[in-house]
Amino acid sequence: PIDTELEARSSKLIAEFEDSVQSLSPDLWVEKSYHKLISHYEEQGWPERSLQVVDIALKQYKYRIEFYITKVRLLMSLSRYEEALEIVNQAYHLSPYDVEIPLLKAKVLTIQGYEEEALLIIDELKLIFQKTDLQEILLMEAFINESMKDFEKMFYTLKEALTINPNNSKALQQIWVSVEFSKKYEESVELHTEIIDKNPYSYLAWYNLGHA
């Protein structure tokens, strides 16, 4: 019954949005409703529709950084990288101390082939942000290393991330690629043995060790 009620509410919200778009006078909604609509259209595989909702939301909530971040991700999913870069720069001016924004910019630049420029952003972030954010910064650096096919650097970058947090699942999932191409098998065995000593139930660490 609860699921049915939630589904009915969602359907009503979608119908209201469709009607308001057709009438060219979207209603003013609470932020949560916009997020629900965006998620719904994404799940349906309609990123253009999600983008339309984000644009309407930004007219009402022009200082909500979450909508800017969502718009950047949607534009990236549509391979509209120049537009994504423009929006991420707007977001940076609104919230320069949100680490997610420069990381998104670094990702866009990397996909466009400007890896060196992306690495400069990473170097700046390492000087500014605290250890709590360093894991995400290192994961993005590893993404850039992989794009540059510098798999040895990618290995050491992910190793650093795992030194900070041995249970970082993203780093554990990505590091095998760097091991395979850099041939850092001995160091990989040593690293994953240390991780397993700390957490004997780390499935990913056991998996990587088994392939080393």
Residue ranges and their predicted role:
Residues A57, Q90-A91, E124-L127, E160-A161, ...:
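Canonical positions in the second alpha-helix
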Residues K32, E66, E100, L134-E136, ...:
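Start-of-helix register in tetratricopeptide repeats
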Residues K62, P96, Q130-T132, P166, ...:
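Short coil turns that delineate tetratricopeptide repeat
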